[in-house]
Every structure is written in C-alpha cells, then in structure tokens.
UniProtKB/Swiss-Prot annotation:
The presence of a 'disulfide through disulfide knot' structurally defines this protein as a knottin. It is found in: Secreted. Expressed by the venom gland. Probable ion channel inhibitor. This is U24-theraphotoxin-Cg1a.
Length: 79
C-alpha cells in the first residue's frame, strides 16, 4: 500500500513539473518570437550603419556619412 502511495505521489509531481515546463516553454517562445519580429529588416530610402555606399551620392541615413576613403556608411562624429 505504501509503495502505491509513493508511486502516485511521484506521478503527480511528474505531471506538475511537466505542466510547469510547458507553460515556461510557451512563455519563452513568445518572448523569442517578439524579439525576432522586431529585428526584421525594414525597407527604407537610406543606408544604415556599415552598408556599402557611393560617396558621390551619399545615401546614408541621417547621422551617418560616406567618404571616399571608406565606402561604407559610418557614424558622422562631427555632425
């Protein structure tokens, strides 16, 4: 009788842990999907940081600049 009680208690603990793990896993999946949804590339008319550019027609986004010596968009320190 005692053995059956111990097996029943262990089964209940196992089911409780499994349910808790599934709830935690679904929460993690929601957080990860939200993070990756934010990082999807957006279409824009300007080039972002470290994008290859042409200094003749500087299409870098505001705050970045393209120079002849380094043909990629970088932060414009001097404004």
């Amino acid at each position: 009788m005692r053995v059956l009680f111990i097996i029943a208690v262990l089964a209940l603990i196992s089911v409780g842990c499994y349910a808790s793990e599934m709830k935690d896993r679904s929460s993690r999946n929601e957080v990860l999907s939200a993070i990756f949804a934010i990082e999807e590339p957006q279409e824009r008319d300007c080039l972002g940081l470290f994008w290859i550019c042409n200094y003749m027609d500087d299409k870098c986004c505001p705050g970045y600049k393209c120079e002849r010596s380094s043909p990629w968009c970088k932060i414009d320190i001097w404004g």
